Amino acid sequence: MAYAYLFKYIIIGDTGVGKSCLLLQFTDKRFQPVHDLTIGVEFGARMITIDGKQIKLQIWDTAGQESFRSITRSYYRGAAGALLVYDITRRDTFNHLTTWLEDARQHSNSNMVIMLIGNKSDLESRREVKKEEGEAFAREHGLIFMETSAKTASNVEEAFINTAKEIYEKIQEGVFDINNEANGIKIGPQHAATNASHGSNQGGQQAGGGCC
């Protein structure tokens, strides 16, 4: 399907916080309770609609283990959005957020949109990190924040889509250079075809949109 833009995402955070489960819930609308540890990087994609335009999200799910950190760093470059995930039932995953955030900001473009996600909100009885703590961390570091449950799908759609909306707004404001794919944004055939139809009223033969 033709799209106006392609946005590249990266999902980061400690091992076991539910990164792969969030991706699977968003792309396939299913929950897999037992999931093998991600080795290196996994990939998923889905089309969404923002402001009447088709947007393709290309999502890279990274390994949380320290031994794979150098691989993860290479994927920060060329990402327009990042989902930084912790587990609300494990205080240590929240404590490690600063390290993940510093890593992301050091190796990514300065305009990358970061969504902080407190996952496993369905396990309220085992909560170790208050929602207010997540909100405060997000405020302090200029992040968007949501709590989600990959198991029940609560706020999963919203987390991915709200990140895309923020990226789209930055495009409209001219913050992102959309002609530089290093920013994690690619102009699609739908966008090119729309511009071509606006730019020519001479009745001449127009070339069709290319494929990507």
UniProtKB/Swiss-Prot annotation:
The record lists the effect of residue 65 to L as: Constitutively active. Interacts with GARIN1B
- Where are the annotated segments for Disordered? 190-212
Question: What residues does Mg(2+) bind to?
Answer: 20, 38, 61
Positions of the UniProt region annotated as Required for interaction with PRKCI: 2-19
Q: Where is this motif: Switch 1?
A: 37-42
Write down the required cofactor(s): Mg(2+)
Q: What is its main location?
A: endoplasmic reticulum
Q: Is the keyword Repressor assigned to this protein? A: no
Q: Where does GTP bind?
A: 16-21, 38, 64, 119-120, 122, 150-151
Broad enzyme group? hydrolase
EC annotation from Swiss-Prot or TrEMBL:
3.6.5.2
From the record, which residues define motif Switch 2? 63-72
Q: Which Gene Ontology terms describe the biological processes this protein takes part in?
A: autophagosome-lysosome fusion; Golgi organization; intracellular protein transport; macroautophagy
UniProt modified residues of type N-acetylalanine: 2
Residue ranges annotated as compositionally biased, kind Gly residues, are 201-212
Q: Does the keyword Oxidoreductase apply?
A: no
One of the entry's Gene Ontology molecular-function terms is: GDP binding
Lipid moiety-binding region (S-geranylgeranyl cysteine) = 211-212
Write down the InterPro entries for this protein, in alphabetical order: P-loop_NTPase, Rab_GTPases_membrane_traffic, Small_GTP-bd, Small_GTPase
Give the protein's biological function. The small GTPases Rab are key regulators of intracellular membrane trafficking, from the formation of transport vesicles to their fusion with membranes. Rabs cycle between active GTP-bound and inactive GDP-bound states. In their active state, drive transport of vesicular carriers from donor organelles to acceptor organelles to regulate the membrane traffic that maintains organelle identity and morphology.
Subunit structure, briefly? Answer: Interacts with PRKCI. Interacts with TRIP11. Interacts (in GTP-bound form) with GARIN1B. Interacts (GTP-bound) with HOPS complex component VPS39; interaction contributes to obtaining a functional HOPS complex that promotes autophagosome-lysosome membrane fusion driven by STX17-SNAP29-VAMP8. Interacts with VPS41.
What is written about domains in the entry's comments? Switch I, switch II and the interswitch regions are characteristic of Rab GTPases and mediate the interactions with Rab downstream effectors. The switch regions undergo conformational changes upon nucleotide binding which drives interaction with specific sets of effector proteins, with most effectors only binding to GTP-bound Rab.
Its protein name is Ras-related protein Rab-2A
